[in-house]
Amino acid sequence: MSELPVTHLNFNQDTSCVALGLMTGYKIVNIQLKFGKCCCYNDDSINLIEMLYTTSLIVMTPLGNEIGSSPRELKIKNTKTNSTICSLFFPTTILNIKLTRDHLIVVLENQIYIYEIKTMKLLQTIKTDSNPLGLCAVSYDQETNLLAFPSPPKAKDALASMRSSSGNAKSTHAAGTSHNSHNGANKGTVFKGDLILFDLNKFQPIMAISAHKNDIAAVAFSADGTLISTASHKGTIVRVFDTNTGVKLFQFRRGSYPTKIYSLQFSLDNKYVLATSSSMTVHIFRLGEDEALETKHKKRIKTINEEPSAVAAAAIAAAREASNNGGETTTTTTAAAATSGPRENGGEDDDSDSMDDDLDVDDDDDNEDDCDDDDDETPVKQRKLSQGSSNSYASINSEDINSPVIDQNRLSVARIIRRQSQNLGRKAAQKMGDYLPSRFSSILEPTRHFASIKVEAKHKDVKSIATINNSQHDIISLQYDSRDNMDANLLQINVVTSEGMLYIYGLDSERGGDCILLNLYSLIDE
């Protein structure tokens, strides 16, 4: 990261602005209505920076390179006057900060501090297990008002014995069916990819979601707080859960080879999820509305209600009691508090070993299929609809307006071969989908991304974040059939990188496929 000019990059809550932490201060750029309007300030080298919508309030932490600065210090500043409102010091390095209209959340490796933003009164301190990435997410909707953070790892056989002796107390976790929860499990198997959902209105943990078997690398709430998306350290699977029930609504295969997921981002209308990764690809997953999935989710909820977990309910109750005991402001998240009740089999498909493909220059086109999907019987309709959610490769000479967009600049022999192979699998799945169990049809036809982007970076280890908006610039791409078609269907993808570049891509909301580069800007040049 020493070669890169940007030390930290972050969108504000409504993704209208981007804040850049620099070695010489920070910069805020409006990337929507008043595109190009920016504020630049000279300061210490910045480690973290967080905006509060488009207000003049920002929160930052320094890298600590300068004399007198420390990564344990948090500064709240007014950008209009470039003055420091207040400064706080913490016992260890600050790993993450989040701002809402009501709260300031500061994440350390083993603690989370929650402050009231108006008075800076400390409202709650949550003790957590080791969280070296400072991973957390906040819903900005004041009604849902949730905080998510990783739960401590726990042993699977210990959970089984605890559940068997806990009676039939009501469970607060609803992450799916438990028909394959413990089949074939080895003693001492540890699950690391669980999330705690914490209510910021009641200051109580309300749910533990079994998201992945591996450690979680990225997590994000939707704008209304009703959905949460996760990815593990392996980076091959992206999942979307309902925050009200904990039920897994969607599962997508990003690729087959491990990569680091840098960020997840929902569109404001909850129709898409974007994932950026160390392979410099951006994957766009479409959250389709088919009734077959709804039927599957209702069956899972019913199963959960019939087989509740007493351990989760008891742990949550204990945490609430500790939170309300004599005005205590500390909640300790233990392994029991993170107990997630019935566990989905879907969490185990992150662990299949795979080898890097030397021919693979475009990670979004990996061809290894997901052979560890849920064992639940998937309706035929879902298997057929999943074809529309995959980035199928149409013939270059095809004039089908519904076929995915193909970027000629990304064309390669390896890519064509992989896509032809995937098309054969999909055709086989369509022909035999009515006769094969869903587990086998999912091998032939996994649910993949709807569209993708390959960002051309000049350096290695370039981080990126991305967001999706309606088209706002009159930039015509020759890749589209007509101006009218472009205007009707075009969505705008903004990708910001730690090289200080803003890339603007066009996504055809009907066809998907490759997103076309419309323009690019340098955000750090004067």
Swiss-Prot record:
Keywords assigned: Autophagy, Endosome, Membrane, Protein transport, Repeat, Transport, Vacuole, WD repeat
Chain location of the short sequence motif L/FRRG motif per the record: 252-256
WD repeat positions: 211-251, 256-295, 470-515
Domain of life, source organism: Eukaryota
InterPro entries from the UniProt entry: PROPPIN, WD40/YVTN_repeat-like_dom_sf, WD40_repeat_dom_sf, WD40_rpt
Region (Disordered): 162-185, 321-397
Family (UniProt): Belongs to the WD repeat PROPPIN family.
Annotated protein name in UniProt: Autophagy-related protein 18
